[in-house]
């Protein structure tokens, strides 16, 4: 009987849920803000985990560029505490060493969506006013 998912995939899914709960309930650092765990890459031996996070306060237009750096640094500083809480929440022989990385896929997706919307809007304007295209 074949397994649908490997053990590392199952552990990473459960770890993603647990870390998201820990960030939401336990981490009180204001530099972290509203952090969302978007994915986890786990090594085959389950000793290392790369946690990808997004910050919702970065999505606003008036966001400080250093917000991401400060948030990742705060999470790196709290990684030992997060790892301790993770060890209590999950039954693993070895709790992985956590490293945090910023996941910009949400912002890139929004940028791509805006580009597509602008192209569609320009295309509709050109269809309505076919002669105005030559004036530009």
Curated annotation (Swiss-Prot):
GO terms for biological process: maturation of SSU-rRNA; ribosome biogenesis. Pfam families: RBFA (PF02033). GO terms for molecular function: ribosomal small subunit binding. Its main location: cytoplasm. The keyword Nuclease does not apply. InterPro entries: KH_dom-like_a/b (IPR015946), RbfA (IPR000238), RbfA_dom_sf (IPR023799), Ribosome-bd_factorA_CS (IPR020053). One of its GO terms (cellular component) is cytosol. Keywords: Cytoplasm, Ribosome biogenesis. One of several proteins that assist in the late maturation steps of the functional core of the 30S ribosomal subunit. Associates with free 30S ribosomal subunits (but not with 30S subunits that are part of 70S ribosomes or polysomes). Required for efficient processing of 16S rRNA. May interact with the 5'-terminal helix region of 16S rRNA. Monomer. Binds 30S ribosomal subunits, but not 50S ribosomal subunits or 70S ribosomes. This is Ribosome-binding factor A. It comes from Yersinia pestis.
């Amino acid at each position: 009987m074949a397994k649908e998912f490997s053990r590392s995939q199952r552990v990473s899914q459960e770890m993603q849920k647990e870390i998201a709960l820990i960030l939401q309930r336990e981490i009180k650092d204001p530099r972290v803000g509203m952090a969302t765990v978007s994915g986890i890459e786990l090594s085959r031996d389950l000793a290392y985990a790369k946690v990808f996070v997004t910050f919702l306060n970065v999505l606003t237009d008036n966001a400080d560029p250093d917000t991401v750096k400060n948030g990742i640094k705060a999470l790196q500083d709290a990684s030992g505490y997060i790892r301790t809480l993770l060890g209590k929440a999950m039954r693993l022989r070895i709790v992985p060493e956590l490293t945090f990385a910023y996941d910009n896929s949400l912002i890139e997706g929004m940028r791509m969506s805006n580009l597509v919307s602008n192209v569609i809007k320009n295309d509709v304007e050109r269809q309505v006013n076919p002669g105005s295209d030559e004036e530009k």
